[in-house]
Curated annotation (Swiss-Prot):
Residues 551-554 are annotated as: Critical for lipid-binding. Residues 364-531 are annotated as: Middle domain. The C-terminal GTPase effector domain (GED) is involved in oligomerization and viral target recognition. It holds the Pfam family Dynamin_N. The lineage of its organism: Eukaryota, Metazoa, Chordata, Craniata, Vertebrata. This is Interferon-induced GTP-binding protein Mx1. Residues 365-628 are annotated as: Stalk. Transmembrane segments: none annotated. Gene3D superfamilies: Dynamin, middle domain, P-loop containing nucleotide triphosphate hydrolases. GO terms for cellular component: cytoplasm; endoplasmic reticulum membrane; microtubule; nucleus; perinuclear region of cytoplasm; plasma membrane; presynapse. Residues 570-658 form the GED domain. Residues 176-179 are annotated as: G3 motif. PROSITE patterns: G_DYNAMIN_1, G_DYNAMIN_2, GED. It comes from Eumetopias jubatus (Steller sea lion).
Length: 658
């Protein structure tokens, strides 16, 4: 309703007509006087723009992206739903047995504030037709339903738009939905009941939709399927209005029960109930006009001993219903506009970001295609450079490729340390075994170099396969990263992506072999036991100092028994092994990662970039390389259409006086 300050509220469903149609009617009757002109201006400024805004957004197709404020009309078959819509719109809609409304019908009613002639328009799919006579509406709606849903009793989710402009209709937009059916009859699909409920729920589930539930007065309201569906999606009744029809068919003695329902005392809805008496089948056969039917309706409620009170409360007659619905729709639109604006903004930003992934359209001109391909390849090469230099952009929960590789190198250093430190006691036994086998004429206390050399070579040799395994692991990581970059840049061009992926694999196999060859060569060189004299002497001195100070108790504790039973030279050999191991560890732990970085990052990236630039030389392949996936161009087109819709919607919302 509208309170004393002119604000629309939900508390009293009956008194809202004082602002809306009453406002418009007064403005239309006395357009020459200043007060009425003021009312007309208020009507034009407050009511019309709200509904026109939402209708324009719906016409743009914004409803494909997000929900718009709407009033959806639902009801069981034979509930009187069509009669209510006819009374509101002033035009005859399809009638008959079975499912009459087979497609959602957007009924846009526009009140003309002057004496302009009645006009209508039917729109669906790519078809649009102006209508000059109200009697043509029913035929055109039937044609539209047959074109969309086919001949027969099938239904469709596709919208039909009917626009009616007249001095005798309220400013209102309704969505008429198929009547609820339970059993398939005739040539209806076997699951017609499921189909209709699914279609209805698609609309009434949305929080932006006011559900207008049409219920006959002569049925038990508690068992009504339409009201049950509304309660399921709106359990608190916040956005549901009940419309009671056929009060003239109520059995004698049950009128008070109908009044209780209408006064919201039985099945409570926060927005309450309205009651109307529309044309019945006999009225139609008697050719009672809609205007005459409205007068008969008012006379019925004024003269009825039980229902008169509902008229006095503003809960009865079609004109009161029209005003109430317009009031509700305006309130609902104003309430949801801020949220709608935010949703449009968020969707616009999201689609813009998604569209960037698909890039721009491929040019038609050959020379432009060359520049387009150059840009694509340069962008790819730039990403490869960033990756190999450890400067690529990564998400919040991701890490750079170089970080992953560095972790593998750290694991490598731990492997070396673990292999060299493996079992001091076992090494002591190994020293003893080699000493017994290879000791020559040396006197006790002299180190046998052959023993030292064989042991150190064996320890280093054991690291060769782990090094090669690390190479393969890192190569696979780099290949996967390069492939991801290729997909990110070329996914929509399947030939270019496939060509790039093939090059990534070919270069990988080539350089992996070279890197493995270099690693194995390094380990072959490590079989030459060598270290600069000064470096080795310093390392040996450090080992002996640690041994003397008792810091390296492992030598003394683990080998004391072995030394006492064999020869003092075992301790000396162990010290030499530790000294040489330190220097060998430094060499191997650094040089193997250098080999991998050189071949698998630096050379791999450079060679791939050069091979990609070579693609530009063969102009005959440009069209083939830039051939898009059909779904890519379709998706880009769809995203652009959505973006254009939302951009227009944002502009219209920005201009709305609000």
């Amino acid at each position: 309703m509208v309170n004393s300050k002119g604000k629309i509220t939900d508390s009293d469903p009956g008194s809202s007509h004082l602002l809306l149609n009453g406002l418009a009617d007064k403005a239309g009757k006395n357009q020459d006087t200043e007060p009425e002109n003021s009312l007309c201006s208020q009507y034009e400024e407050k009511v019309r723009p709200c509904i026109d805004l939402i209708d324009s957004l719906r016409a743009l197709g914004v409803e494909q992206d997000l929900a718009l404020p709407a009033i959806a009309v639902i009801g069981d078959q034979s509930s009187g739903k069509s009669s209510v819509l006819e009374a509101l719109s002033g035009v005859a809609l399809p009638r008959g047995s079975g499912i009459v409304t087979r497609c959602p019908l957007v009924l846009k009613l526009k009140k003309l504030l002057n004496k302009d002639e009645w006009r209508g328009k039917v729109s669906y799919q790519d078809f649009e037709m102006e209508i000059s006579d109200p009697s043509e509406v029913e035929v055109e709606i039937n044609k539209a339903q047959n074109a969309i849903a086919g001949e027969g009793q099938g239904i469709s989710h596709e919208l039909i738009s009917l626009e009616v402009s007249s001095p005798h209709v309220p400013d209102l937009t309704l969505i008429d939905l198929p009547g609820i059916t339970r059993v398939a009859v005739g040539n209806q699909p076997a699951d017609i009941g499921h189909q209709t409920k699914k279609l209805i729920k698609k609309y009434i589930l949305k929080q932006e939709t006011i559900n207008l539930v049409v219920v006959p007065c002569n049925v038990d309201i508690a068992t009504t399927e339409a009201l049950s569906m509304a309660e399921e999606v709106d359990p608190d009744g916040d956005r549901t209005i009940g419309i009671l029809t056929k009060p003239d068919l109520v059995d004698r003695g049950t009128e008070s029960k109908v009044v209780d329902v209408a006064q919201n005392l039985v099945c409570h809805l926060k927005k309450g109930y309205m009651i109307v008496k529309c044309r019945g089948q006999q009225d139609i056969q008697d050719q009672v006009t809609l205007t005459e039917a409205l007068q008969k309706e008012r006379d019925f409620f004024e003269d009825h001993p039980h229902f008169r009170v509902l008229l006095e409360e503003g809960r009865a007659t079609v004109p009161c219903l029209a005003d109430r619905l317009t009031s509700e729709l305006i309130t609902h639109i104003c309430k949801t506009l801020p949220l709608l604006e935010n949703q449009i903004k968020e969707n616009y930003e999201k689609i813009t970001e998604e569209l960037q992934k698909y890039g721009s359209d491929v040019p038609e001109e050959e020379h432009e295609k060359m520049f387009f391909l150059i840009e694509k390849i340069n962008a790819f090469n730039h990403d490869i450079t960033s990756l190999t230099e450890g400067e690529e952009f990564v998400g919040e929960d991701e890490c750079r490729l170089f970080t992953k590789i560095r972790n593998e190198f750290h694991k490598w250093s731990l492997v070396i340390e673990k292999r060299f430190q493996r079992g001091y006691k076992a090494i002591c036994k190994q020293i003893e075994r080699f000493e017994n086998r290879y000791r020559g004429r040396e006197l006790p206390g002299f180190v046998n170099y052959k023993t030292f050399e064989i042991i150190i070579k064996q320890q280093i040799k054991e690291l060769e396969e782990p090094a090669v395994y690390m190479l393969h692991t890192i190569t696979d990581m780099v290949q996967a990263a390069f492939t991801d970059i290729s997909e990110a840049n070329f996914a929509e061009f399947f030939n270019l992506y496939r060509t790039t992926k093939s090059k990534i694999e070919d270069i990988k196999f080539e350089l992996e072999k070279e890197a493995e060859k270099s690693i194995r060569l390094h380990f072959q060189m490590e079989q030459i036991v060598y270290c600069q004299d000064q470096v080795y002497q310093c390392a040996l001195q450090r080992v002996r100092e640690e041994s003397d100070k008792g810091k390296d108790r492992k030598i003394n504790s683990m080998c004391s028994k072995e030394v006492s039973s064999v020869n003092i030279s075992l301790s000396d050999i162990f010290e030499h092994l530790l000294a040489y191991r330190q220097e060998a560890t430094n060499r191997i732990s650094s040089h193997i990662p250098l080999i991998i970085q050189y071949f698998i990052l630096q050379v791999y990236g450079q060679k791939l970039q050069k091979d990609m630039l070579l693609l530009l030389h063969d102009k005959d392949t440009h069209n083939w390389l830039l051939k898009e996936r059909s779904d890519t161009s379709d998706k880009r087109k769809l995203l652009k259409e959505r973006l254009a819709r939302l951009a227009q919607a944002r502009r219209r919302l920005a201009k709305f006086p609000g």
